């Protein structure tokens, strides 16, 4: 299910103060958050950037090893994007493009990355109170991924998200 929310993604708070919010974004395989929402996440959740970058370095920044995958990294309570009284947020990095892919390839990598993310969150849910909606399904908060720097029409990514049994809160301004 996709729910569109007009507002600031970074202002999202889960309904329960014991739940961990997950913010997802599409990112490159180069280990650099240099533009778009990634650059904002780097400022608001600085503790997550070395984890993302290290993950890319571990894979040799090789698109063939990263595209279509995801990595979920925890932030620290001291990060300026976290709010007192709520658990630190998790940042989900979806490896959807290396800037050399067609729109169709990016969409296919997005499908694989979302599938990997869902699997990772279900596993994480065994030990961490990941935010869930009223339906009991995992909630993932995100902007219109791929629609910015990667220039994929939103409708193509939206069709991928609709396939998954997850609640996606898509923030629009």
Swiss-Prot record:
Q: Where does the Macro domain lie?
A: 1-173
Q: Name one GO biological process term.
A: peptidyl-glutamate ADP-deribosylation
Residue sites binding substrate per the record: 7-9, 26-28, 33-38, 145-151
One GO molecular-function entry: ADP-ribosyl-[dinitrogen reductase] hydrolase activity
Origin organism of this chain?
Scheffersomyces stipitis (strain ATCC 58785 / CBS 6054 / NBRC 10063 / NRRL Y-11545)
Pfam families documented for this protein: Macro (PF01661)
The UniProt catalytic activity note for this protein reads: ADP-alpha-D-ribose 1''-phosphate + H2O = ADP-D-ribose + phosphate
Q: What high-level taxonomic lineage is stated for the organism? A: Eukaryota, Fungi, Dikarya, Ascomycota, Saccharomycotina
Q: Which UniProt keywords apply?
A: Hydrolase, Protein phosphatase
Coiled coil region boundaries: none
Summarizing the function annotation, the protein's role is: Highly specific phosphatase involved in the metabolism of ADP-ribose 1''-phosphate (Appr1p) which is produced as a consequence of tRNA splicing.
Identify the coding gene: POA1
Q: What is this protein called?
A: ADP-ribose 1''-phosphate phosphatase
- Family of this protein: Belongs to the POA1 family.
Keyword Cell division applies: no
- E.C. numbers: 3.1.3.84
Q: Identify the enzyme class.
A: hydrolase
């Amino acid at each position: 299910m996709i729910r569109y929310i007009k507002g600031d993604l970074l202002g999202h708070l889960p309904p329960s103060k014991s739940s961990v919010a997950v913010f997802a974004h599409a990112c490159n395989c180069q280990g650099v958050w240099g533009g778009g929402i990634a650059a904002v996440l780097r400022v608001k959740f600085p503790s997550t950037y070395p984890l993302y970058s290290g993950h890319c370095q571990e894979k040799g920044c090789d698109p063939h090893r990263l595209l279509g995958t995801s990595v979920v990294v925890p932030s620290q309570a001291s990060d300026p994007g976290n709010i007192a009284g709520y658990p630190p947020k998790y940042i989900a990095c979806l490896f959807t493009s290396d800037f050399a892919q067609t729109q169709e390839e990016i969409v296919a990598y997005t499908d694989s990355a979302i599938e990997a993310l869902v699997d990772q969150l279900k596993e994480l849910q065994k030990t961490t109170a990941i935010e869930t909606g009223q339906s009991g399904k995992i909630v993932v908060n995100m902007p219109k991924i791929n629609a910015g720097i990667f220039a994929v029409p939103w409708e193509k990514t939206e069709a991928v998200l609709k396939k998954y049994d997850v609640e996606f809160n898509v923030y629009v301004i």
